[in-house]
Amino acid sequence: NVSSTTAYQPVPSLAVYAAAKAFVLSFSQSLWYEARQHGVTVFSFAPGPTHTEFFDVIGDNATAVGRMQSADQVAAAGLRALDRRFTPPSAVSGVGNAITAALARLVPRRVLMPALARSLRPVDTKR
């Protein structure tokens, strides 16, 4: 299942997207545990900012400039994670994204939320 690094943190102006991706992550991790005794592999992959049309659609390319992975890099990272001898319940693409996801869980929300709000501008819903 495809999640996102937004699953690891609240994202002002993308609240529904972040919540949906958090659901995918949590659901997949639970299913990973439940299904493994039956020989079924369930996996959640969380790419970070990826060079696609997504940022063009929301009108914000500046947020992730310099941190974006290509779609090929993301796909290769996902396949590497799936190819491990023991597939983990989830994986994040890229070392920088994995560090960011881990730190987002450690930083108090009262500190994290204003920083995220400053780095993201609201989506223009009138387009």
Question: Would you name each region that the model predicts?
Answer:
Residues 4:
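Residue(s) in the substrate-gating loop at a strand-loop-helix junction
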Residues 88-121:
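A transmembrane-helix-recognition feature enriched in membrane-embedded lipid enzymes
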Residues 44, 62-101:
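C-terminal helical subdomain
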Residues 9, 30-41:
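Active-site-adjacent segment of SDR/Rossmann-fold oxidoreductases
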Residues 20:
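Active-site helix of classical SDR
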Residues 17, 25:
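Catalytic tyrosine of NAD(P)H-dependent dehydrogenase/reductases that use a Tyr as the general acid/base
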